[in-house]
C-alpha cells in the first residue's frame, strides 16, 4: 500500500488488489460483506496513523477511484471546530457509514470496469484476424477513434487533412502523453465516406482499441468541436 500525505488534514493511498488479498481479504469480501469491509478499512486507517500520525477524529470525507490494478482512496478530516464536540462513538459511527457508502461506490465502479475490460477483450478478439492494423477499415460504425503519438502528429493532421468538419463532431483527449481523436459522424454520412475518412486519419495517426467509455473516464478532454480548426488557431505548421 502506498500512502501519500497531502496536507495536515488529507491523506491519499493506493492499494493493489494483490495487496488486498495478501492482507487476508478478497474483493468479494469488500464489495459484499459489510463487516469485512469495515474491518479492512479500519486496518488501513491504523496503518495510516502509524506511518503518518493521521488520527481519525471528527467527520471524514472519503473519495474512491477504482482502477484496473487497485483502488485509490482520499481521506480528509474536517477542519470544522465543531468536530471537537463529537464523541469517539459518534466518530466511529460516522466513519462506518462513510465506509459503507465508499464500498457501494467502489462496487459500482468495479462493475463498470468489468464491462469496460470485457469490451476491450472483445475488441481485441475482433481484430485478431486482421492482417495489418493500417489496412483495417471500420464496418457499419459512426464513431472512430485514432491515436497520435505526440502533438506534432496532431498539428500535421490539422494542417494537411481535407475532411469536411461539418459532417461530424469531434473530441481530442490526452492520457499518458498520448493524444486520442474521437469522431462521431452524422447519420447523413455514408459508410463509404466514413471508411475514407478513417483511411485519411491513418496517414497521420494509428488505430487504437481505446473506447469512448475509457477515454471519458480516464483521459482529459483537450479540445472539442472542430478540433482541427482550434489546432490551426493555436499552433503553426511544424512542416513549414
Swiss-Prot record:
Q: Where is this region: Disordered?
A: 119-138
Q: Name one GO molecular function term.
A: protein-macromolecule adaptor activity
Biased region (Basic and acidic residues) positions are 119-132
Which domain of life does this protein belong to?
A: Bacteria
**Which InterPro entries does the record associate with it?**
MecA_C_sf, Neg-reg_MecA
Cite the NCBIfam families for this sequence.
PRK02315.1-3, PRK02315.1-5
The record's comment on protein family reads:
Belongs to the MecA family.
The role this protein plays is: Enables the recognition and targeting of unfolded and aggregated proteins to the ClpC protease or to other proteins involved in proteolysis.
Q: What is known of its domains?
A: The N-terminal domain probably binds unfolded/aggregated proteins; the C-terminal domain interacts with ClpC.
The protein's assembly and partners: Homodimer.
Designated name of the protein: Adapter protein MecA
Question: What gene, per UniProt, encodes this protein?
Answer: mecA
Amino acid at each position: 500500500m502506498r500512502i501519500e500525505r497531502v496536507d495536515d488534514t488529507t491523506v491519499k493511498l493506493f492499494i493493489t488488489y494483490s495487496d488486498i488479498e495478501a492482507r487476508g481479504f478478497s474483493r468479494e469480501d469488500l464489495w459484499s460483506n459489510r463487516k469485512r469491509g469495515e474491518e479492512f478499512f479500519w486496518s488501513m486507517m491504523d496503518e495510516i496513523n502509524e506511518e503518518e500520525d493521521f488520527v481519525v477524529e471528527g467527520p471524514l470525507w472519503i473519495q474512491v477511484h477504482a482502477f484496473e490494478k487497485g483502488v485509490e482512496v482520499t481521506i480528509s478530516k474536517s477542519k470544522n471546530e465543531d468536530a471537537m464536540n463529537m464523541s469517539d462513538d459518534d466518530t466511529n459511527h460516522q466513519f462506518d457509514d462513510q465506509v459503507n457508502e465508499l464500498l457501494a461506490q467502489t462496487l459500482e465502479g468495479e462493475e463498470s470496469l468489468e464491462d469496460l475490460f470485457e469490451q476491450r477483450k472483445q475488441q481485441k478478439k475482433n481484430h485478431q484476424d486482421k492482417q495489418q492494423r493500417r489496412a483495417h477499415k471500420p464496418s457499419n460504425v459512426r464513431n472512430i477513434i485514432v491515436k497520435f503519438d505526440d502533438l506534432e502528429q496532431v498539428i500535421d493532421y490539422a494542417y494537411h487533412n481535407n475532411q469536411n468538419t461539418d459532417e461530424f463532431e469531434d473530441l481530442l483527449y490526452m492520457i499518458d502523453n498520448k493524444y486520442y481523436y474521437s469522431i462521431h459522424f452524422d447519420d447523413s454520412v455514408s459508410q463509404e465516406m466514413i471508411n475514407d475518412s478513417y483511411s485519411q486519419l491513418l496517414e497521420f495517426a494509428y488505430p487504437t482499441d481505446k473506447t469512448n467509455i475509457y477515454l471519458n473516464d480516464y483521459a482529459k478532454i483537450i479540445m472539442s468541436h472542430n478540433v482541427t480548426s482550434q489546432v490551426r488557431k493555436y499552433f503553426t505548421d511544424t512542416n513549414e
